[in-house]
C-alpha cells in the first residue's frame, strides 16, 4: 500500500495584510493492481508469412484522500473541516494485429486486420458533499482490414493498397450514454 502525506500552507494577502490562511494536511493511499498478457506468432505456413500479435492489459486503482483544512482570516474568522474523496479507475485494453503475406508474380501481396478495445471506468465521490461526485465510462474500439501489393524495381519500390477502418467512441455519464461526446467513424 503506497501512502503519501502532504502538509501545505496557502496564505492570501490584500494590501499587505493577511486576508486568509489555509492550512491543509492531506493523506492519500493508492492501492492498485495491474495484469498484462501478450501472445504472438511469427512464422511461415505453406508459403504464407504470418505475423500475429495480441495484447491485453487490466489496471485497477483506488485512491482515498483525506484533507484536514483549517481556514482563518478576517473574512472567515476560523473554520475547520474534513474533506474526504474516493477515486477509482478501472481500465481494460485489448489489441491484436494479424498480417499474412505471400509472394505473387512480380511482387508480394499482404492482407491484414487490426482490432483494439479500450474501456475506462472512473468514479469520484466526496463523502461530505463539498465537491461534486462524478461517474464516467469510456468505451473505444477500432477495427480495420487492409490489403497491400508491393513490387520492387531494382532500387525502387512501389506500394498500392486499400484500408477500411471503423472507429467508435462512446461516453457515459452516470451510466447514461452521452450522444454529443460519442462518435463513430467509417473510413
Model-found features: residue ranges?
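Primarily recognizes Gram-negative and organellar outer-membrane beta-barrels
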Residues: 1-187
Amino acid at each position: 500500500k503506497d501512502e503519501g502525506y502532504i502538509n501545505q500552507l496557502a496564505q492570501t494577502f490584500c494590501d499587505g495584510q493577511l486576508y486568509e490562511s489555509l492550512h491543509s494536511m492531506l493523506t492519500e493511499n493508492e492501492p492498485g493492481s495491474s495484469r498484462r498478457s501478450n501472445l504472438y506468432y511469427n512464422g511461415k505456413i505453406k508459403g504464407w508469412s504470418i505475423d500475429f500479435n495480441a495484447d491485453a492489459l487490466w489496471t485497477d486503482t483506488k485512491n482515498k484522500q483525506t484533507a484536514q483544512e483549517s481556514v482563518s482570516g478576517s473574512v472567515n474568522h476560523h473554520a475547520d473541516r474534513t474533506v474526504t474523496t474516493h477515486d477509482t479507475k478501472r481500465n481494460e485494453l485489448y489489441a491484436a494485429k494479424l498480417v499474412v503475406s505471400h509472394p505473387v508474380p512480380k511482387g508480394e501481396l499482404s492482407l491484414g486486420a487490426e482490432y483494439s478495445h479500450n474501456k475506462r471506468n472512473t468514479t469520484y465521490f466526496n463523502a461530505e458533499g463539498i465537491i461534486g461526485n462524478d461517474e464516467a465510462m469510456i468505451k473505444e474500439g477500432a477495427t480495420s482490414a487492409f490489403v497491400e501489393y508491393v513490387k520492387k524495381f531494382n532500387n525502387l519500390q512501389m506500394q498500392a493498397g486499400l484500408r477500411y477502418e471503423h472507429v467508435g467512441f462512446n461516453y457515459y455519464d452516470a451510466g447514461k450514454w452521452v450522444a454529443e461526446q460519442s462518435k463513430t467513424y467509417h473510413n
